[in-house]
Amino acid sequence: MACQLAAPPKIVSHGAETFGDLYAKTMICESRDGGQFALTHLPVQTEADTEVAGAPVLITSGMFTGRGFWISPKGLGLAAELVKRGFEVYILERRGLGESPRQQTARAGLNEAILYDLPAVQGLIAQRNPQPLFVMGHSFGGVMMAASLATNHMQRSGIAGVVMFGSQLTVDKPFLNPPWSVIPKLLCKLFGYFPSKKLKMGPFNEPPAAMEDAVNWVSAAKSRGDFVFWNGFDKLQMPVLALGGGCDTVDPPSGVRFLAEKFSSKDRTFKLLAKADGFAQDYDHVGMVVSRQAANEVWPLVADWMGKRAKLKN
């Protein structure tokens, strides 16, 4: 059954920013459950390539990171590359991360992102730009996008394509599996948050609810029982591009391929970013997006893939 577009979030505040020579607006948004998150909007710049006609892209990061993963203060990054190619980019930072408020009155987990925040942003973008939406995520960010579509909280029919970097739940991840999964739970109780910065895992600490959901998702995805995590993935028929790093030990490429194969799309591509497949290096979990070599060969691959599908939709 098709779902209706979610209502846009309430915009609590907004302000203008620049990233190098790119201008942007950052909004603090509030979902219907009261949770707040940051949304950075990079509109089509006047000098951009017009062939993709401002096709919208919604990007979100994985654990412990924010918009800096996609665009630097100097205007460098995959998000900036997409803007220069003529795409209209929105970057969502989950509750409690990046520019989002640290103090939340509502739960700040991954579940809330797929239930409330991602659908609300889809509704906001659709009001402003009627073109089909591309969604993009790294690590857990890609999993969240796919899960929100599979559960029909985001509207599937309005999606031009899904791009996932190192996104998977089923291979390794010992820290999120019993018995080791007790450690993040204990650390959250001790600090009141997961101390990612102290552990040098990323620039932002995670809310306890997000770690709780991460543990539950991994357990559910690996379960051989009757759990519903994968329900709805066979209904995902939009184009999908899944990229796995040849030396990614955080989210190994076999798991990335497994997630991509859960989609029923006829337009489904898995790329192994490795020397064996013609790339300049074997990419790791971060380097597949944030590295000079990725800028040379991965960003153009992704932008070209999206550009072809934007033209097909227009």
Predicted regions and their residues:
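Alpha/beta-hydrolase-fold enzymes
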Residues: 127, 131, 136, 140-225
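Catalytic active-site module of serine/aspartate enzymes centered on a nucleophile-bearing elbow/loop
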Residues: 273-314
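Alpha/beta-hydrolase active-site loop
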Residues: 107-127
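N-terminal cap/lid segment of alpha/beta-hydrolase-fold proteins
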Residues: 8-50
